[in-house]
């Protein structure tokens, strides 16, 4: 493969990665359906906690280093493999600090020690796969990176299906299959990274990637904002589940998790938009006029997506979710309906979509620490809202506690939206569309609350479709100027 063909391409790579994410999410959804039907609700909730707990803890081992490799690797593809090896060395040293914590967690859960050990292993394997997958992307082979993700999910889902066909209800067996899929994904990523990046001159060192790679200290300092952000970001979607597990039990965690599944799938939309917008903003951050033009266009697209997402999400969940999951998650047996909880979470989805411009502006800006500050603020607010609202709800009923968990998630999404606008200095732009912003948020809240209560007030959401034409027009404007992005990439 020539150096030219190995150059990353925004358009090509984003299509491969987005497509793989969609397929992986669909396969993961099928896997969750199998788990929900194969396991008791308590076992299912325990499985979720075991995976989420170590995934959240060990994500700190990432250290933000793969992000640096993705940024600096394309400038010198021959040094990508040495850079990846250096990342593994630093992450290995960091693991020595986390090993005692992992051992303590396993020992404190003596009745579930095997499951906890498997959860820790899955998390470690996933962390180990970040560097080779990033190496593939930096070398211009996002296609193979995408295949590793899809194959991992295929293996896991097939394994779940085999166990389900054998009428297995052993949560440890399902966790073992999850680990097997993760290992296969890691091995494929390592094979691909070596095939593309590992056959060059062995004398090349990672220091040629840039000045920040001159020493371990400079690497860690340069990666620190990314490391902190990666370390705390997962808590945003998991805090409510941890608090529910503490206040109530694993049955309630399982129900809230089912409601979150479709919501998380919907978050692929803002995630894809951030990925597409970031290189555009990064290339134009020294041109304030053009920078603001991009943000304005994307903001109009976001407004146009809100009504489409609300209708699509509500329709899909209303029809398909009860078909896939057991009736106990919807008939009130566990204290609430996952469908009604999802309708409340839709408010947070809309706010997350609307936060894309300000969120990405902070990522692309000259002061990445402001982005870290935003994420810290969101996590702190999510914790405070969760402890207060879920605690108050638990004093009344299980159903109200689960509902309050959804409202806590919505509140943290609102903090992310408004905090991003303030920190990115876009409050004046916000005020220019002040009436549109306030009206949109008000109608979204009324619509989603009405959907959760199955009220005719949900029809007020149809008013949001007045935003669709401006979104379509902005999308045409953005798509009509791809040459600018190609020029930026070439430079």
Where do the protein language model's features map onto the residues?
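Specific pore-lining/lateral-gate transmembrane helices of multi-pass inner-membrane transport
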Residues: 72-87, 218, 255-376
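Short runs within selected transmembrane alpha-helices of multi-pass transporters and secretion channels
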Residues: 24-28, 32, 50-70, 118-137, ...
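Membrane-water interface segments that mark the loop-to-transmembrane alpha-helix transition
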Residues: 12-25, 50, 55, 59-110, ...
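N-terminal membrane topogenesis motif
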Residues: 1-27, 192-193, 206-229, 292, ...
